[in-house]
Amino acid sequence: MIDKEQLLSLLGISEIEIERVVIENPKTIKIHIKSLKDGSHCHGCGKAINCFHGYGPEIELRHLPILGYKVYLVIRPKRYRCEICEGRLTTSQVLDWYTPKSAMTTAYEQDVMRALINSTLQDVSLKYDLGTAAIQEVVDRLIETKVNWTPIAALNVIGIDEIALKKGHRDFVAIVSAYIDGELRVIGLLAERTKAAVRDFFLSIPKRLRRTVKMVCSDLYLGFIAAAKSVFGPRVAICADRFHVAKLYRQGVDDLRKKEMKRLRQSLSKEAYDALKNAHWIVRKSRHELTADERRILNRLFQHSPRIREAYELCEALTAIYDAPVSKGQGKRKIRGWMQRVANSQLTCFNRFLKTLNSHWEEITNYFIDRRTSGFVEGLNNKIKVIKRRCYGITNRDHLFQRVYLDLNGHARFA
């Protein structure tokens, strides 16, 4: 004998009464219930109505499992008649524990969404015995495909970067993100990374929120920088990510290393050259990251190539400037001093970086204002790459936006 009161407690739904329980097979229970709530709201005029007009057609709703059983709640919604509207419209009662036209209770939908975090439609489909289309329908109902600006109070710092939707293709999308109330949020997935597309997105941000933006973090792509400048103007600092900058000046050292290693292969004995094994990895590390063996190999390389030593030391010096707790003005002076050292060295491996440095002087030195990086954007890029691999190369931007939101914010939303 099933105790209806205990079963009602397990269901976790109030204002209902269990009429009967049917065990259809060893895996499925159907619980027939009725609402104890009275009244509804007219779908015509929106006013409260209490004139009972019978019951609507029976509906089945998938609910949370109990003791390993699939659970379906079976209910005939009460209907009420409006005495005000012409034609005396009738309306079905809407209860707060399920959404009209959904085949699941709200609790079950949220359970499905939690299962989908860091997972795939296919895996959840197998686990819950649901079709992937049914799961995607829940996703579409609960997660928007664009950011909802209404609850957002401020943006402060915006990050923007790009990612290829298809491996090996130049099918790039721009990713715009921000920390909102301590949570990393994607606020835009743009079909193009052009200046016009990014500018249009920035202009789509409500004026009240555009006024709260203090900094835009980006790589050195001209389209992103130009779009941010055209919309936000001089009031907002455009900050070139220090790690993109570091990649450029470190590339200069690496290019020099390749040339010097080719020269050393010709000039050194095989034994002496082999003693420089793994030098290509070692030169890419900072001194404090090296092991004792790696330091010996690096010093050996420096003995054979003073030019690499000089370039390596200049690279380390610029990194030290970035790491130092200095103001923007101090940072500018230190970098100008570094540029003079490069000029005095007569090294040419930094020429490309120096050209970029002169072209984007303000954006690069804006890092020292608040020591901001777009590292959170790079982390988000890696997250999206994982989602794409896990979801078998998802290319639909709307679905990608939903999946990124779910993985980043799903636990807080559906806890």
Question: Model-derived features: where do they sit?
Answer:
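Basic, amphipathic alpha-helical segments enriched in Lys/Arg and hydrophobic/aromatic residues
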Residues: 339-415
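Helix-loop elements that line ligand-binding/catalytic pockets
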Residues: 272-346
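N-terminal alpha-helical interaction blocks
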Residues: 1-38
